Amino acid sequence: MPTKGDYQPPKDGILSKLPESAVPYGELLRIHRPLGYYLNISPYVVGVAYTAAISPVTLPSTFLLGRLVILSLWGFCIRSAGCAWNDLIDMDIDRQVSRTKLRPLPRGAVSPSGAALLAAFMFGCGGSLLLLLPSQCAFEAAIVVFFALLYPFGKRFSDHPQLILTNIAWAIPMAMSSLDMSPLDFPIPTLAMSFSIASVIVMIDIVYACQDAEEDKKVGARSMAVRYMEITDQIAYGLFFSGTLSLLVGGILRGLGFPFLIFSVGGHFLGFLRFLRASLGKGAKSALVESQAKSSCLLATMLLVFGLCFEYCVRL
C-alpha cells in the first residue's frame, strides 16, 4: 500500500501555488491536468459555434458569449466532480496501479467522506448553473451527470467503459437548447456532430489508457485498451476517420461552405492525425501521449471553431 512517505509534493505548476493543505484536493479535482478540462469544455464551445453557424436567425454575439461562459463553467464543474467521484469509486484499483497509487485517496491524504463531499459540492455548483439556462437543458444535463456517475463502474462490468464517455457529446444538443434551438429541428446534423465529438473522446481515452493496459489487466480493470490490446491502433484510426466524416456530414447537411470545409474539417483532420502519429507506437508508458493530446486537440479545436465562426460572420 502506498504511504505518504512515497509521495513528493509538487515543486512547480499550479499545485505548488496552493496551500499545503489544499494540494490533495487540487489533485483530486485534477486542476493540474488541463487536458481533461479541455475535453469536457471544448465540446460546448464547438456546440455554441455550430449552433450560431447553422441558426436560421442571426444570434446576437453577446447572447452567444453569455451562454458560452455558463456552459464552460458547467463543463468545469462536472469535470471536477467526475474526477473526485471516479477516484472515490476506483480507490481500490488505484492502489494497485503505479501511475495512480499516489493519488490523494490511495495515499490517505483525503478521506473517502471528504472526496464524496467535494464531488457533491461540485455537482451542486454545476446544477446551480442550470438555473441560468432554458429548462430543456436540464434533460441533457441529467444525461451527462448520470453517465458521469456510472463511468467508474464501467471498468468492473464491461470491456467498453470508454463508450460511457460519449456522454460528453451531449454538449452539442445542450448547447443548441441553451440557444433556444431544438436539436430535433435538425436531427441528422445534430447526431453527426455529436458522433464526431464522441469519436474524438473515445479515441483519446483509448490511446491514453494504453499507458496502464498491462497493469489494468493484472488487477482486473477492464477497458477497450485491455480488450483490444493488439488492435488499438486500428480502432483509434477507425474512430478518427469516422469522426472526421461525421463532422463533414454535420456541416454539409446544414449548408456550411468552404470556411467550414477548409478550417473546421481540415483542422480536425490535421490536428488529430498529428496526435495519433505522435502517440501510437511509442510504448505503453509514453510520456508524449498527454502533451501531444493537449497541443493537437487545441490546434484541432481552434481551427474547428474558427471555421464555424467564419460561417457565422458570413451570415451576418
From Swiss-Prot:
The keyword Nucleotide-binding does not apply. InterPro entries: Prenyltransferase, UbiA_prenyltransferase, UbiA_prenylTrfase_CS, UbiA_sf. Disulfide bonds: none annotated. It is a multi-pass membrane protein. It catalyses: 3,5-dimethylorsellinate + (2E,6E)-farnesyl diphosphate = (3R)-3-farnesyl-6-hydroxy-2,3,5-trimethyl-4-oxocyclohexa-1,5-diene-1-carboxylate + diphosphate + H(+). It is found in: Membrane. The keyword Magnesium applies. The chain crosses the membrane at residues 45-65, 69-89, 114-134, 135-155, 163-183, 188-208, 231-253, 257-276, 296-316. Keywords: Magnesium, Membrane, Transferase, Transmembrane, Transmembrane helix. CDD domains: PT_UbiA_COQ2. GO terms for molecular function: 4-hydroxybenzoate polyprenyltransferase activity. One of its GO terms (cellular component) is mitochondrial inner membrane. Pathway: Secondary metabolite biosynthesis; terpenoid biosynthesis. Polyprenyl transferase; part of the gene cluster that mediates the biosynthesis of paraherquonin, a meroterpenoid with a unique, highly congested hexacyclic molecular architecture. The first step of the pathway is the synthesis of 3,5-dimethylorsellinic acid (DMOA) by the polyketide synthase prhL. Belongs to the UbiA prenyltransferase family. PANTHER family: POLYPRENYL TRANSFERASE AUSN, PRENYLTRANSFERASES. This is Polyprenyl transferase prhE. It comes from Penicillium brasilianum. The lineage of its organism: Eukaryota, Fungi, Dikarya, Ascomycota, Pezizomycotina. The gene is prhE.
